[in-house]
Each structure stands twice: as C-alpha cells, then as structure tokens.
C-alpha cells in the first residue's frame, strides 16, 4: 500500500561515493535533502581497493575538495598510508594516493552525513520513479513509501540487476554479498533510457597471519605527508606498510589450466569490463611473454586482518583461486577470507545526459557514478558532487554549474561521458586532459574554490584559506623578482647543485627558473623570506616560475579552445534541416544535442567540415535574427 512519506527539494538514491557527495552538496547549499540507501551499513563502502587517489584520480579528489566536497577531508581522517606518485616527472602528473582504513572511511562518512543539517538519511530500496509529463516528481520504495521532490539523483553504483560470478557459480547480488536492486533498471528502460551492461571485479581478501612478508618488498608511505584537503595544513600520523610480491610461472600454469572455468572465458559474461584494471586471467593471456606480474598486498584497515591482493582480480572458481594464490611468492600458506568475484550491472548510456548530468528526456532527473558508466570511487564522487550542485541550482532556478575541459579534470570527465560516451567502464587518467599543466592537483583551489563559493557551496572559511594562499603566492613572486643576489653569494650554492655560475647579479626569480635550483635550495641565500608563507604557496611559486613559458603557451591554447566553447548552439536547432551536414553528423548532433560548437567538434562522427557547416549556419542564423544586417 503506497503512502505519502514526505516532500523534499532533492532526493538522492544510493549512498556510495557519488551519493554521499551529491547529498552533502545539496544539503550544504540549503536544499532539504533525503538520502535513501538499501542498507545504512554500506555508506561510502569501498568494495574493491582500499585506496583513494592515484594518477589522474588524485586530481579529481583535490578538485572535489576545492569545490567543497567531502572525499578529501574524509580520506585525511582515515588514511593509513600516503604517497605522492610520479614525483620523478613534471608537476602536471604528480598524483596523491592514500591507503584508507575501509571501516573508518565508512563510519566517518556516515557520521558526517548524520550530522549534516538539511539532510535526512533513510534505509529503503527505491523500486519506482514518480513521473508526470516527462518530469520526475519523486520515488517509491519497496515498502510503499512515496517521497516527493523537485529533483532526484540516481547514484545506484553496481546494484542495478547486479550479478556475481565466481567460476561456474553465479547469483543475483550487489557487491560484497549485499542485496541487488532488481526493479529500478526495468523502470528506467520503460522510460526510454538506453541501458547497457558493464562488469567489474575484485580480488580475494586474505588473512594477514597467513602471509610471509619476509619474502616481499616493503613499501612505506612518504615521510612528509601531503593532505588531500586544502583545509588541512600538515598531518602527522603513524603509517603502515604495503608489500610488493610477484606471480610465478606456476601461477600462470594454474591459471591457463583452469581458464575454461573462468566466468569471463567460459562465455557466461558478455558485458564489458574496465580496460585499465584487467583480471589476472587477462594479464596472463594478453601478456604471455611476461614471466611474472607485480602483486601488492595492502591492509584493509587497522582493526582487521583482511589484506587486499591488488593485481589479482579474477572470476575463477574459489578452489582455483586458493591454488593460484599459493603459488605467489610469500603467499604459499595464504588463507582466503573473501573470494574474488566479477560483478555485472546495468548502467545508462551517458550520452543521454546533459553536461549538468540531468537526463535529457526526463526533467529534473540527475545521475552520477558507476550508473553513468565510470569506474572508481573518485570518478563517482566527482559526478555526484556536480549532480548535487546542479540539482539544487535547477531547484532554485539559477544558472547551471558546468566546468569545461580547461577548468578541471571534472570537466574532462563529464565532457568525455556526455559527448563521446563510453563502451567500457571509464577511468580518469592525466593523458585524457589536454591542458594538464594548468589542471595540476596543487592549484585545484586556485581554479575552483571561488567559483564554488559564488554558487553557495564552498564555506567562507575555505574561501579565506584560498585567498590567503593566493596573496602569499602573488606577494612572494613579486618579492622574488625584486630580490637580487650577487655572484659571490649565489655561486657557491649553484656550484653545489651543479648549475652554471653567474657573472653578474641575478634575481631569485630568474635563478629559480633553473631546473637544478629549487625553492628549498634558495633558502640558504634568501634571508628575507617570509617564514609564515604556507607550504602550498611555496610549491605553487616554484611551479609557476619554472614552467612560466609552458604555462603561457597552454593559456594561449585555452583561449583558442574557449572561442569554440563560447559559440553556443541553441537547443531548438533541427540538425536534419541543415544543408551540408553529413548524414552521420546530423544523427549524432541530434542525439547528443551539444551545448556549444566546441562540444560538437568532439563528437565521434562529426568532422571538421561538419563544424564549418555549423559555423556558417550559426552566422546565417545570427544575421536573420538581426534583420539581415552584419
């Protein structure tokens, strides 16, 4: 029996990483928000790897934080090891990665959600959407409760018609043995949503006491811990190690002899998995020339003996997993606590979404996370944050908040999804960003915090921290330009760091341009340095000065990019009626309905000649609107 259970501004369906960010963003912007999840015990659950960040993904976490999201803050509270990756390369690809304590990550996020004003958390399974005139009006739960709202955000993760595979065994399930959602996907299909089937997988968890760490290589965290959140200065914490080992020829033999029992190789699963996170079967088959593969043994938390076997995702039968693990160096006595599995699930074709993450043909219905075809906690959180923001802005009748490819990795992520779509679970990488020297993780607050404050999400305290850092950077760069040092003073330091000597006085600014000279090195000859300058500002000053020419070049490229992005395409355009457009271009443009000429140019199947036709059409349209004048 259905009953009216209440009215809200925004309803969020799902409490994974996308759902948490969506609900918190909506509530913090003043919207009366309801968050529904199938179980309160799975909030911000990490069903796969126990880490946050990494190459490309760390950039997303920093951007989420700069906008006012929670992932960075929660990771800083709960990490057990932290490392900055790619430090031997340029700053554009430096990426922070932290091992999180899974249980603490969940409990801390749950606590944050429970204590957030304007946000109500309830356990319930959503089985239907309330739709009137192609507009969502609310949701219906399995118990018959009808919750009404202005906007609904779907953040259902891998639960829609979830099915787990372990060798020849398969059964309907969500991740980690939780209940799947079996009804909502069918409803979405009836509403005209083009749903597809993706898959992902996770390795076994083994008992810590069954691992021989003496045969493995210890990997420690960084001594100087860099926080994810711009709200944190420095963090001191005792860290735990991870361990590196390798597969053996015997491992590969066990896999190949049982390949026909793998759910994927048996043909039981026809869905598409993540390209950049292949199963161990895939790695052994595709890279048969490699004698071994790296395996990392990672702790799941401080209060558990479970260890995550990174690099051994599989859908082989449990007894084969056991035999396979025992052939890995140091795992000869390994005891499985949770078997590895593959999981299939339904998700939406993201080209059906607007850049705001609103479903094009269902007004006020937004979505985020793996439901949109991505993989990874960070990609999910980024989308959830943007969906939450835009759901509130639409409720208020305000302009949407859309980041383009030159402003954020979040912009790259969403633009790729809604413009190009994806035929496999999408993963963020630094190589996807054209302007990565501008979109560094260290300057995410410089790029995004002020924008977020203007829409009512970033707090005043966050804005003030950003403004202080900004002033420190500006003042320090000015001071470095004005401060000259003599050859007598500078040359001993330059010689010590194998940099060419100077014959006349030179500014600290010009000295810092040299690759061998760091901001830290200059301290020895820089008596007037402001000791209170924040660490982040010091790092930014050095990057801005060292890469000045490259940054200026990229900014010029962005100016050209913006010219096409700023040419808006009216949504009422009939592309089938534009002479000169190729048939494929007409179909693709009609389906995706790009917001700008720039977005249109990135659609697969739209050629440069089609863009030229569009530009001519827009100019003709402008002249007609102006009465035929120029």
UniProtKB/Swiss-Prot annotation:
One Pfam family named in its UniProt record: GIDA_C_1st
MF-aspect GO terms: flavin adenine dinucleotide binding
Cofactor names: FAD
Disulfide-linked positions: none
One term under GO cellular component: cytosol
Record keywords: Cytoplasm, FAD, Flavoprotein, NAD, tRNA processing
Major subcellular location class: cytoplasm
InterPro entries named among the record's database cross-references: FAD/NAD-bd_sf (IPR036188), GIDA_C_N (IPR049312), MnmG (IPR004416), MnmG-rel (IPR002218), MnmG-rel_CS (IPR020595), MnmG_C (IPR026904), MnmG_C_subdom (IPR047001), MnmG_C_subdom_sf (IPR044920)
Claim: NAD is one of the keywords in the record: yes
Subcellular location: Cytoplasm
Residues involved in FAD binding: 14-19, 126, 181, 370
Record has RNA-binding as a keyword: no
Residues that, per the record, bind NAD(+): 273-287
GO biological process: tRNA methylation; tRNA wobble uridine modification
Oligomer status and interactors: Homodimer. Heterotetramer of two MnmE and two MnmG subunits.
Family: Belongs to the MnmG family.
Protein purpose: NAD-binding protein involved in the addition of a carboxymethylaminomethyl (cmnm) group at the wobble position (U34) of certain tRNAs, forming tRNA-cmnm(5)s(2)U34.
Protein name as annotated: tRNA uridine 5-carboxymethylaminomethyl modification enzyme MnmG
Lineage: Bacteria, Bacillati, Bacillota, Clostridia, Peptostreptococcales
């Amino acid at each position: 029996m259905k009953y009216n259970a209440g009215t809200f501004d925004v309803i969020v369906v799902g409490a994974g990483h996308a759902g948490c960010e969506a609900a918190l963003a909506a509530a913090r912007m003043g919207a009366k928000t309801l968050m529904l999840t199938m179980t309160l015990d799975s909030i911000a659950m990490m069903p796969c790897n126990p880490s946050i960040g990494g190459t490309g993904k760390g950039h997303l976490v920093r951007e989420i934080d700069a906008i006012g999201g929670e992932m960075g803050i929660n990771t800083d509270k709960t990490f057990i090891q932290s490392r900055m990756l790619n430090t031997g390369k340029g700053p554009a690809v430096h990426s922070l990665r932290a091992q999180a304590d899974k249980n603490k990550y969940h409990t801390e996020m749950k606590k944050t959600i429970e204590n957030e004003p304007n946000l109500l958390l309830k356990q319930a399974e959503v089985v239907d959407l309330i739709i009137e005139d192609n507009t969502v009006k609310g949701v219906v739960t399995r118990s018959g409760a009808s919750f009404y709202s202005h906007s609904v955000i779907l953040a259902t993760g891998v639960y829609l018609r979830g099915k787990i595979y372990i060798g020849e065994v398969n059964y309907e399930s969500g991740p980690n043995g939780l209940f799947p959602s079996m009804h909502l996907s069918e409803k979405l299909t009836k509403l005209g949503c083009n749903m597809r089937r993706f898959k992902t997988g996770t390795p076994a968890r083994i008992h810590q006491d069954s691992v021989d760490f003496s045969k493995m290589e210890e990997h420690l965290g960084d001594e100087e811990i860099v926080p994810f959140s711009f709200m944190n200065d420095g963090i001191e914490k005792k860290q735990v190690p991870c361990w590196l080992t390798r597969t053996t020829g015997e491992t590969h033999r066990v896999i190949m002899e049982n390949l026909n029992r793998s759910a994927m190789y048996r043909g039981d699963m026809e869905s598409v998995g993540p390209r950049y996170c292949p199963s161990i079967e895939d790695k052994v088959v595709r890279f048969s020339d490699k004698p071994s593969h790296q395996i990392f043994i990672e702790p799941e938390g401080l209060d558990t003996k479970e260890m995550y076997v990174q690099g051994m995702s599989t859908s082989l039968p449990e007894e084969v997993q056991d035999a396979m693990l025992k052939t890995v160096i140091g795992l000869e006595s390994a005891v499985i606590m949770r078997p590895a599995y593959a999981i299939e699930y339904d998700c939406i074709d993201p080209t059906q979404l607007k850049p705001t993450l609103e479903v094009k043909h269902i007004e006020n219905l937004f979505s985020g996370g793996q439901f949109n075809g991505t993989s990874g906690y960070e990609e999910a959180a980024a989308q959830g944050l943007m969906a939450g923001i835009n759901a509130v802005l639409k409720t208020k009748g305000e302009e949407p908040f859309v980041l383009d490819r030159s402003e954020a990795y979040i912009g790259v992520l969403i633009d790729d999804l809604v413009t190009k779509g994806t035929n496999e679970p999408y993963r963020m990488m630094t190589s996807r960003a054209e302007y990565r020297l501008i979109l560094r993780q260290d300057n995410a607050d410089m790029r995004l915090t002020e924008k977020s404050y203007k829409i009512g999400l970033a707090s005043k305290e966050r804005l003030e921290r950003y403004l202080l850092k900004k002033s420190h950077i500006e003042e320090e760069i000015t001071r470095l330009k004005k401060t000259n040092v003599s050859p007598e003073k500078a040359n001993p330091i330059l010689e010590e760091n194998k940099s060419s000597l100077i014959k006349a006085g030179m500014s600290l600014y010009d000295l810092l341009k040299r690759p061998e000279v760091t901001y830290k090195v200059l301290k020895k000859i820089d008596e007037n340095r402001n000791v209170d300058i924040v660490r982040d500002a010091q790092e930014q000053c050095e990057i801005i000065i060292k890469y000045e020419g490259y940054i200026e070049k990229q900014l010029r490229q962005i100016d050209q990019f913006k010219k096409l992005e700023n040419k808006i395409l009216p949504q009422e355009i009939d592309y089938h009626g534009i002479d000169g457009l190729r048939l494929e271009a007409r179909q693709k443009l009609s389906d995706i309905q790009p917001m700008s000429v720039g977005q249109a140019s990135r659609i697969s199947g739209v050629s440069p000649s089609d863009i030229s036709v569009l530009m001519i059409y827009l100019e003709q349209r402008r002249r007609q609107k102006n009465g035929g004048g120029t």
